[in-house]
């Protein structure tokens, strides 16, 4: 099913985040874009979108292509949920999942697969947005795992 919502033009910022999922787990890697001295584990693919009236599915595919050197999959990002950022007021986040059939289909430096429980039990290790999204991403990861193992 295509997600054809247009990105809102009245928000300060719109961010598209893509969560690679496989075997019921979420792929994360260290990101230091907020604090260089204390990198937090977060989703590896995220972009700020400043365009007005842009299709979020199209933008998510562009973001995935930007990271093609880390991916070995033809899968497309799938819309999951729209929510507001925990850390930046006025920021809307469009969260996508990238379903992978094998954990070998993705490689970022220092990246790894974790469960939503890992994220919940170790809040200081993960970004605030990922902590907010972890339960939903855990359910999405399990759903895609069930789908691929039918």
What are these regions, as identified by a protein language model?
Residues 2-28, 49:
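Conserved N-terminal beta-strand and adjoining loop/helix that marks the start
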Residues 35-41, 106-150:
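Nudix hydrolase/Nudix homology domain
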Residues 4, 62, 108-110:
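Positively charged, low-complexity intrinsically disordered regions
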Residues 25-70:
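Conserved Nudix-box catalytic region and its N-terminal flanking loop in Nudix hydrolases
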Residues 12-14, 22, 74-75, 81-112, ...:
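Active-site-adjacent beta-strand/loop module that shapes the phosphate/pyrophosphate-binding cleft
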